């Protein structure tokens, strides 16, 4: 009888440990998911207004129309070579693209009012895998009204403006990658619309 | 000289290098340098550009001579700021006051002024756009830790001058007002030789 009790006792402890382990693992998973869903610093929630028109050519003359990119998240990034934070941020955009599935998030660079020579020389040095649309007279940038350069707008699969990044950042750092992966796998309707 | 593309690139890269270097230098230790205000959880930097710096930057971006000549009639002051307050800080340069050593108000040339000038000389849209993005916004509700920077342009004063800034705070501008001052700014008097083609 006492032996049974001992065996029972020995059996009970692993069960307790297993339960505690499961709780711990569950807590870690929940925390990780919650962290992944957190909005990292510097991203302003927008009101879901329709994105302004954007139809421009790149340096090779190829046309990109934002409307053709419906169905996936799009980052529209306005920049210029003379802008210090833009120069610092551009390599991180290239690394971000390398780490994100293209069907989830599409990066659209828009250079504001510079020449092919200026853009070609700069991108070739710091982000040779990226190409940029050319807003040659700056009118498209004006229509989008970024708060400054650089500015990144996150557009949901239905073509609505959901987030605006304030200034430059390391887009390839884990908090931003986790956030981008999280929003780009969630249905657009579930993205929070509360304005800060 | 203005038509020489190699010269334009050299001048542009030089100006860019100067700007980047000065930005790094200013960021190193804001409390120990002139041209810096720190307080109320915000940092403001202000630095008057020399005519050669201003001209080199825009010349390097392919601006036409007519626009460069207009720049020579103004002094460019580069201002940057960032705050770590929990509320909104309102950037509104129209509320700032610039005064010379005798206390006289120095006129600021805002975007309306420049738009009239560009229209009068039929400046290219690309150059107008670039110029506009290099200016400090006329109004901005700066969020916590949101960086902002750009130029304000003034009628060139003789001698040192001060910049007194006022920031409303809070979403509806109902928070405490922040007032600060940066002293000892100086604009160089002479025009840039790069515009007139007299550079050596």
Language model: regions and residue ranges:
Chain B
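Intrinsically disordered, low-complexity peptide-like regions
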Residues: 1-2, 108
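Bacterial N-terminal signal peptides that target proteins for export
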Residues: 2-15
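Bacterial N-terminal signal peptides
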Residues: 13-23
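Conserved functional micro-motifs across diverse proteins
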Residues: 27-200
């Amino acid at each position: 009888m006492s032996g049974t009790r001992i065996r029972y006792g020995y059996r009970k402890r692993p069960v307790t440990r297993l339960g505690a382990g499961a709780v711990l693992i569950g807590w870690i998973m929940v925390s990780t998911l919650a962290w992944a869903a957190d909005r990292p610093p510097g991203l302003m929630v927008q009101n879901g207004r329709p994105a302004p028109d954007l139809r421009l050519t790149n340096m090779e003359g190829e046309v990109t129309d934002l409307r053709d990119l419906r169905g996936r998240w799009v980052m529209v990034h306005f920049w210029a070579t003379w802008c210090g934070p833009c120069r610092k941020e551009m390599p991180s955009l290239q690394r971000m693209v390398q780490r994100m599935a293209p069907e989830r998030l599409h990066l659209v660079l828009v250079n504001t009012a510079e020449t092919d020579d200026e853009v070609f020389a700069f991108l070739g040095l710091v982000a040779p895998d990226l190409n940029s649309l050319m807003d040659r007279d700056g009118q498209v940038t004006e229509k989008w009204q970024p708060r400054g350069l650089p500015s990144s707008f996150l557009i949901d699969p239905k073509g609505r403006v959901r987030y605006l990044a304030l200034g430059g950042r390391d887009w390839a750092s884990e908090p931003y990658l986790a956030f981008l992966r999280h929003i780009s796998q969630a249905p657009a309707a579930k993205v929070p619309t509360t304005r800060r | 000289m203005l038509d020489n593309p190699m010269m334009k690139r050299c001048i542009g890269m030089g100006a860019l290098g100067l700007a980047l270097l000065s930005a790094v230098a200013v960021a190193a230790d804001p409390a120990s340098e002139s041209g810096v205000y720190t307080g109320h959880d915000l940092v403001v930097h202000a630095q008057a550009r020399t005519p050669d710096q201003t001209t080199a930057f825009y010349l390097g971006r392919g601006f036409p001579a007519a626009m460069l000549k207009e720049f020579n009639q103004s002094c460019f002051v580069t201002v940057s700021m960032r705050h770590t307050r929990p509320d909104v800080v309102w950037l509104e340069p129209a509320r700032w006051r610039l005064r010379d050593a005798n206390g006289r108000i120095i006129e600021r040339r805002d975007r309306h002024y420049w738009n009239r000038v560009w229209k009068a000389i039929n400046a290219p849209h690309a150059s107008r756009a670039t110029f506009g993005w290099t200016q400090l916004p006329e109004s901005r509700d700066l969020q916590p830790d949101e960086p902002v920077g750009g130029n304000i342009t003034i009628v060139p004063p003789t001698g040192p001058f001060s910049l007194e800034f006022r920031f409303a705070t809070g979403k509806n501008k109902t928070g405490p007002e922040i007032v600060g001052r940066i002293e000892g700014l100086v604009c160089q008097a002479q025009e840039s030789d790069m515009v007139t083609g007299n550079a050596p």
